[in-house]
From Swiss-Prot:
Residues 419-578 form the Helicase C-terminal domain. The Q motif is unique to and characteristic of the DEAD box family of RNA helicases and controls ATP binding and hydrolysis. ATP-binding RNA helicase involved in the biogenesis of 60S ribosomal subunits and is required for the normal formation of 25S and 5.8S rRNAs. Residues 60-69 have a biased composition (Basic and acidic residues). Pfam families: DEAD, Helicase_C. This is ATP-dependent RNA helicase DBP6. It is found in: Nucleus, Nucleolus. One of its GO terms (biological process) is maturation of LSU-rRNA from tricistronic rRNA transcript (SSU-rRNA, 5.8S rRNA, LSU-rRNA). The keyword Flavoprotein does not apply. GO terms for molecular function: ATP binding; ATP hydrolysis activity; RNA binding; RNA helicase activity. Belongs to the DEAD box helicase family. DDX51/DBP6 subfamily. InterPro entries: DEAD/DEAH_box_helicase_dom (IPR011545), Helicase_ATP-bd (IPR014001), Helicase_C-like (IPR001650), P-loop_NTPase (IPR027417), RNA-helicase_DEAD-box_CS (IPR000629).
């Protein structure tokens, strides 16, 4: 029916003749061309040109054949066209098969057998250690004490405050003797003898640059030794001479409770002078507090580190006139990283003070466990520091503190709360205010509930009330418990069970005993716990309940080895008769104790 088309891909030798051109009308030629596959539209330009010539020949031939009245093409010509298309298809298939077989053979030849490995760690690159950073850390630890003048003092260094009447102002001396004591404690004597004359002389020479002459002050003194009164006297002595209210002293403390405690001491010393003392109250909004401090700039500001950074960012006040920076409970402050307060504060000081670098502010750093923070002290950029130490040990216990260890056999460890109550009659004091330290918040709640049940069942020989300071209570509840504990009635025993929340800085007068129901984890923590009693030259007692040989060895190796005591101080152990009396339990007491345990179990399970 159709004539074979011209195949441009087919080559003809010389002498061969091309197949006759198909004789199709022009319209039919176009229809046939449109029916071709779209693949032919993407062929080379040479093929398109050849097809165009082919079409022209078809038009010429069709005209000639129309003149002869022929409307169809012979069957032989149609077979030739189909054969040409089929041959092209077969050549394409054969070439594709050849390419596929070559690829398969190549891939088979390149494939390597898989290697079997055992379960071994994957090889890692060698660790690149920053030796420069390690050397830098070592250098920082060494530089923390470089150019440090060590001043040793002992428990015999007491002196009446009247001996300083030629240096201290009349009003300040009257406030000290009337509100605190007539005799200076050892650390107060050491500071007043060494620092006060130097500070007064430097201030009289230059009111602007006297901080460089004095240098920084580091004090390692036991808790309850009068550190707060010591630095407050130095501040009021200098600031009472100023003429205009400007922020000249910042006292940093770690907790809100300490803010108010320090404020009471500083405000009592500033009575009768024009020194303005302010505190940052955490229960007021930051915006309201900022407006108040801007309206009346204080001379002394008592604040926590995080709140200080907030005010610096709000530009509540400037550090341009700052002369004193006091860190109370410095070891705890330096362990805190609220908003990177230390770096932020040092940066602001160097930027805002008239002269840059160390010495632009007198830094007073106080703690009972100061010597363990040498690396962090370097961040404070100390300038010619003077280090006040008592003894050669890390920590020193006050001479008025009596310590006792009560070994408890492991077989009697289940009755530890009962032994605690049996201990009370041996504590010969008219009014017992006992602070019991445990290891966790849950232990505080459980022990307080169990002791209350035991007192209710008659296992206590003295009238006793028990309270628990814990994080489950609201702040108001904890504050009321502390106030009730501090105001305990005469002839009554008050027990307050707490974690180490109460072991730092809190000054409650009249705590007669500290009982370490659970041993602290370090000598540092032990010093702070025992420091809640025997404060301000008053007597106090600490009792440690040691269960089994393990706790006794821990006490000896990790706590007692770091502590120095007065020669005529603690006995450390109960005598054998007292110990046997405490750990020997009657069947009646044991039965009552088990009954109390069942009551506690029912109350916990809610049955």
């Amino acid at each position: 029916m159709f004539a074979a088309r011209f195949d441009p891909s087919r080559h003809y030798e010389e002498g061969d003749t091309a197949p006759p051109a198909p004789s199709l009308p022009m319209k039919r030629s176009r229809d046939a061309q449109q029916d071709e596959s779209e693949s032919e539209m993407s062929s080379a330009e040479s093929e398109d040109e050849a097809m165009q010539l082919d079409d022209e020949e078809e038009v010429v031939d069709s005209k000639g054949k129309e003149n002869h009245g022929s409307d169809s093409i012979g069957t032989g010509e149609a077979d030739k066209r189909h054969q040409s298309v089929l041959s092209r298809f077969q050549r394409t298939i054969s070439v594709q098969d050849k390419l596929d077989s070559d690829a398969i053979v190549g891939s088979d030849s390149e494939e390597e057998p898989a290697k079997m490995h055992g379960l071994v760690p994957i090889a890692q690159p060698a660790i690149v250690r920053d030796t420069l950073a390690q050397d830098s850390r070592k250098e920082r630890k060494l530089l923390a004490w470089s150019n440090t003048t060590k001043i040793h003092y002992d428990s015999t260094m007491t002196k009446p405050f009247a001996a300083y009447k030629d240096i201290l102002s009349t009003s300040l001396l009257a406030n000290v003797e009337g509100g605190f004591s007539r005799t200076a404690f050892p650390i107060q004597t050491a500071l007043l003898d060494s620092v006060l004359p130097l500070m007064s002389q430097a201030y009289s020479v230059s009111k602007r640059y006297y901080t460089r002459k004095v240098g920084d002050i580091l004090v390692n003194a036991s808790t309850g030794s009068g550190k707060t009164l010591a630095y407050a006297m130095l501040l009021i002595h200098i600031l009472s001479r100023r003429t205009v209210n400007k922020l000249r002293a910042v006292i940093l403390v770690p907790t809100k409770l300490l803010v108010h405690q320090v404020y009471d001491t500083v405000q009592a010393l500033a009575k009768g002078s024009s020194v303005v003392v302010a505190v940052s109250k955490m229960d007021t909004s930051l915006k309201e507090e900022s407006a108040k401090l801007k309206a009346q700039e204080p001379d002394v500001l008592i604040i926590t580190p995080g709140r200080l950074v907030d005010h610096l960012n709000m530009q509540t006040f400037s550090l341009k006139n700052l002369k004193f920076l006091v860190l109370d409970e410095a070891d705890r402050l330096l362990n805190q990283s609220f908003q990177n307060w230390c770096i932020e504060l040092m940066t602001r000081l160097n930027a805002e003070r008239p002269f840059k670098g160390p010495g632009n502010v007198i830094k007073m750093i106080f703690s009972a466990t100061l010597t363990t923070n040498t690396e962090r002290l370097h961040d404070l950029q100390l300038h010619n520091p003077k280090l006040f130490l008592m003894g050669s040990q890390l920590y020193h216990m006050p001479a008025q503190l009596q310590e006792y260890n009560l070994p408890i056999p492991t077989s009697k460890s289940y009755a530890k709360p009962l032994i605690l109550l049996r201990l009370l009659p041996l504590l010969s004091t008219e009014s017992l205010r006992i602070l019991v330290f445990v290891k966790s918040n849950e232990a505080s709640i459980r022990l307080a509930a169990l002791l209350t049940a035991m007192v209710g069942n008659g296992l206590s020989a003295v009238s006793t009330t028990v309270g628990s300071i814990n994080n489950n209570n609201s702040k108001a509840t904890n504050r009321k418990l502390i106030e009730a504990f501090a105001a305990g009635a005469s002839g009554h025993c008050s027990i307050l069970v707490s974690t180490d929340l109460m072991s730092r800085g809190l000054d409650i007068s009249g705590i007669s005993h500290v009982i370490n129901y659970d041993l602290p984890i370090s000598s540092q923590q032990y010093v702070h716990r025992c420091g809640r009693t025997a404060r301000a030259n008053t007597s106090g007692t600490a009792v440690n309940l040691l269960v089994g040989k393990g706790e006794q060895n821990f006490w000896k190796d990790h706590i007692d080895s770091d502590i120095s005591r007065a020669p005529d101080g603690s006995h450390l152990f109960f005598d054998e008769e007292q110990r046997e009396q405490l750990v020997s339990l009657s069947e009646e007491d044991t039965a009552t104790y088990k009954k109390c345990l069942e009551e506690l179990k029912k109350s916990v399970l809610g049955r």
